């Protein structure tokens, strides 16, 4: 067997395999014998069709089958010998038989070879969130809202109120467009951005007042859009008093002490924002390394990440897009993000390879024991058995390897903490 590897691009190769008659004839004979057992031709008993007739009728199909099987067999052997890192399945481009040899041509994508830039001089900022008493109370108020009551107030609307109003669109001359009138629209000001023109206009407005809103064009060629809004009612959320009885109802009797509940809310906030801080830091690190190492990406790898992003989007619609939805534009918009995912995978693999990182069974056990410490209701032995199972082990190896990769990076770069307040509207 002879073979020649040709580099087509940074991520593509073509492989030519030349096999002698001694190497491919046994497979041809097997295919002929298999066909002989199954083929049925009028005038011949099953299993007794002459070989010459089988070759005449099924020659091209037999040759194609032999080429595919031998291509698969020898590609695996060559990939191992030549340390090829395939990023896609090898495609059979062409094959040709003659009396003496079989020539097979395959194409496939590979993981690109590249040198990772030294990242030890990089600096990053890590947000350090401090949970205040006010933050805890705001979170409790969010929980209490589910049991609160919207009441009408004869006051100017605040930025947290709900304004009920009729709005009508105006034409360029300021005249009402009757067919574009909406009655009893609810403006939940609390959830509108600070720079939203409706929020700006309605904050401070009272019932029976009229305000005008102008929405300036975002792009050249677009026209200004104007509305007249007639305020009918201002409603404000009235929160109930947090009593022991209400606490039991809200928490399904998990807590019977307001102090314990408050402490739990604080702990949940601290854990959430600690996780957010870590995730934001890791995203900054990956973005910087991708920017400094714009590695070429195999299209099959990018396709895989694109499909993953599409599936995530489908889940937001309950598992499937609406009937008739064309995801072409969505895929196009997600493609750059999929490329970055692929680039980060290649960079991560390079860091793991350079530092000889691997995940052992002991690593998985240690991870399980650490997780069990966070949740006393779960026994470490049970977690170990779960994580070591066939269903979970690959996932755990991937998770722990990622931690090790980030550990290598974080130990090499400079990370400076920066105190930061928790966002005002924290809807976790």
UniProtKB/Swiss-Prot annotation:
Top-level taxonomic group: Bacteria
Family matches, as Gene3D superfamilies: 3.10.50.40, Trigger factor ribosome-binding domain, Trigger factor, C-terminal domain
Enzyme Commission number: 5.2.1.8
Catalysed reaction equations from the record: [protein]-peptidylproline (omega=180) = [protein]-peptidylproline (omega=0)
Residues annotated as signal peptide: none
Keyword Acetylation: no
Compartmental location: Cytoplasm
GO molecular function, one term: peptidyl-prolyl cis-trans isomerase activity
A Pfam family this chain is assigned to: Trigger_N
InterPro entries, per the entry: PPIase_dom_sf (IPR046357), Trig_fac (IPR005215), Trigger_fac_C (IPR008880), Trigger_fac_C_sf (IPR037041), Trigger_fac_ribosome-bd_bac (IPR008881), Trigger_fac_ribosome-bd_sf (IPR036611), Trigger_fact/SurA_dom_sf (IPR027304)
Enzyme class name: isomerase
Record has Chaperone as a keyword: yes
Chain ranges of the PPIase FKBP-type domain: 165-240
An annotated GO BP: protein transport
Homology family: Belongs to the FKBP-type PPIase family. Tig subfamily.
Domain comment as written in the entry: Consists of 3 domains; the N-terminus binds the ribosome, the middle domain has PPIase activity, while the C-terminus has intrinsic chaperone activity on its own.
Described purpose of this protein according to its UniProt entry: Involved in protein export. Acts as a chaperone by maintaining the newly synthesized protein in an open conformation. Functions as a peptidyl-prolyl cis-trans isomerase.
Protein name per the record: Trigger factor
Organism: Prosthecochloris aestuarii (strain DSM 271 / SK 413)
Originating gene: tig
């Amino acid at each position: 067997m002879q073979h020649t590897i040709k580099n087509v691009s940074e991520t593509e190769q073509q492989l030519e395999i030349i096999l002698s008659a001694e190497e491919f004839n046994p497979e041809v004979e097997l295919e002929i014998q298999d066909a002989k057992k199954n083929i049925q031709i009028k005038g011949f008993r099953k299993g007794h069709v002459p070989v010459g007739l089988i070759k005449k009728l099924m020659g091209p199909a037999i040759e194609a089958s032999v080429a595919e099987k031998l291509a698969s067999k020898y590609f695996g052997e060559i990939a191992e010998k030549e340390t090829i890192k395939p990023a896609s399945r090898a495609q059979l481009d062409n094959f040709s038989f003659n009396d003496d040899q079989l020539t097979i041509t395959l194409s496939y994508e590979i993981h690109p070879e590249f040198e990772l830039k030294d990242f030890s001089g990089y600096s990053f900022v890590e947000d350090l969130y401090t949970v205040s008493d006010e933050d805890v109370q705001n979170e409790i108020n969010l929980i209490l809202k589910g049991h609160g009551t919207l009441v009408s107030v004869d006051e100017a609307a605040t930025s947290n109120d709900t304004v009920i109003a009729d709005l009508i669109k105006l034409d360029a001359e300021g005249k009402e467009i009757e067919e574009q009138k909406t009655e009893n629209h609810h403006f939940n000001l609390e959830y509108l951005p600070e720079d939203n023109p409706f929020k700006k206009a309605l904050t401070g407005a009272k019932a029976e007042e009229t305000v005008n809103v102008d929405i300036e064009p975002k792009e050249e060629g677009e026209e200004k859009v104007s509305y007249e809004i007639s305020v009918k009612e201002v409603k404000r959320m009235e929160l109930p008093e947090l009593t022991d009885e209400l606490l039991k109802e809200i928490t399904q009797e998990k807590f019977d002490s307001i102090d314990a509940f408050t402490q739990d809310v604080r702990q949940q906030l601290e854990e959430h924002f600690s996780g957010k801080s870590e995730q934001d830091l890791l995203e900054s690190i990956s973005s910087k390394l991708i920017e400094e190492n714009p590695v070429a990406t195999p299209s099959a790898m990018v396709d895989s990440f694109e499909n993953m992003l599409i599936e995530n989007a489908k889940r937001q619609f309950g598992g499937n897009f609406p009937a008739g939805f064309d995801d072409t534009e969505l895929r196009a918009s997600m493609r750059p993000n999929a490329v970055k995912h692929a680039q980060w995978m290649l960079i991560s693999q390079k860091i793991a390879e350079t530092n000889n990182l691997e995940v052992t069974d002991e690593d998985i056990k240690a991870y399980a024991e650490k997780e069990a410490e966070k949740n006393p209701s779960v026994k470490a032995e049970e977690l170990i058995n779960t994580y070591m199972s066939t269903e979970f082990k690959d996932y755990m190896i991937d998770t722990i390897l990622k931690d090790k990769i980030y550990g290598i990076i974080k130990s090499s770069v400079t990370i400076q903490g920066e105190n930061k307040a928790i966002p005002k509207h924290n809807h976790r």
